[in-house]
Every structure is written in structure tokens, then in C-alpha cells.
Amino acid sequence: MASLSPEIMDKGVIAASAGNHAQGVALSAKTLNTSAIIVMPKTTPEIKVKSVRGLGGEVILYGDNYDEASKRAEEIAKEKGLMIIPPYDDPHVVAGQGTVGMEILQQSKKDIDAIFVPVGGGLSLIHI
């Protein structure tokens, strides 16, 4: 998101996610002083919804699954002129997550025996 133009950032961003991506977009938006709408399936666990809201994201619960939420996010993006922040199929998103493994090694004060990675879409896993 840091690579987006000031014009885009002034409008805010939108994403569809049921978990980690939603939290990442909300936190990034807060850090970069813009707004984020996160469309999440109605089946999303309440703890994840609360986390996104706690990070400043506006949550819209829609649909029974990710595909339905994603389609709604696309509709809202067109209506409001917002940039969609995709969870995995974007070179900037992939590059941003590409530093995860390196950051773990740099920040660890001890040798690492194992790393446990939560897997939703799987993008974080490929960078470890």
C-alpha cells in the first residue's frame, strides 16, 4: 500500500478477506493514514472481525464465503472509486510478504527450531 499514489490513498482502500489479509490491510491503512473497508464473509469468526475493527478497519459482513465477499468488495470499489488490495495475486503484495522469513531470522535472539505458519490463502507460507 505504501506504493499507492496520494490520490488513491486519499480515497481509501478496500479488501475482501476472512482473516490475516484483512488485519494486515486494516493495520497498513491505519499506519498510512488512510481508510480501509474490509468485506468479510458472514461466517468469519467474531475474533477476526473484532481485530479488524480494533485496527481501524470498517467491516462489512457479506455472503457465506470468500468468493461472495470478494464479489461485493469489487462492487463497492467500483461504486466508491476505491483501490482493491488483493490478498495474493498482486506483485506488490507478494513482494511485501517476501520479507517474512528474513524478518523472523533477523529478529530472533535464539536459534529457531520450528516455525508454525497459519495457512489461509497460503501466500505467507511460501516465504518462510
Language model region names:
Residues 1-126:
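PLP-dependent amino-acid enzyme catalytic core
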